[in-house]
């Protein structure tokens, strides 16, 4: 288990699901990339194979031990301050929907501190419409490679989702609590501005990814 309760075995099974290609086509060829919260490198390694120099950051030594073809850095994202900047900073895994405002600002501050003057931050999030489609007491299932995932919604109160996520792969199963904050586009813009960033553009049709640039 990682410090935040993530099962390393599970994350080692999860394949990339189009994220490396989305990032690759959104940034210049050969652009340097800082992957924040890289996990086992399921995005970092394919980006390296596509010609990018990638620095992969995670707080878990166990996760980083599975990272290949990228330079691993063990650190809490919120505390990270490297002596260099990058053409692209990647904040995936819906970390922007963290429940606490202080956590979100700390994540964005790290993004801002490491993006070059002409670079961009690429962020994956759950948009407001994703939350609006959920109802307390419902379950939602899907597959990620060999892993079957199930989201059980307990409650949505004042924009805070209280849920449980379970994963199954073969005869193995992992269960985790899941909390996420709903942000609308106005709130998103305000949080970006507070961190010295400006909304750029949507990177996919479902508005699950967007770019931001330094102010």
List PLM regions with ranges:
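SAM-dependent methyltransferase
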Residues: 122-187
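Conserved class I S-adenosyl-L-methionine
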Residues: 1-39
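A short glycine-rich, Lys/Arg-flanked "PGG" loop and its adjoining helix->strand segment in the class I
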Residues: 105-117
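Residues lining the SAM
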Residues: 92-93
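C-terminal lobe and adjacent flexible extensions of AdoMet/dcAdoMet transferase-like proteins
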Residues: 187, 191-215
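Class I SAM-dependent methyltransferase SAM/SAH-binding core
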Residues: 41-79
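A short acidic, Gly/Pro-enriched loop at the edge of an enzyme's catalytic core
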Residues: 81-89
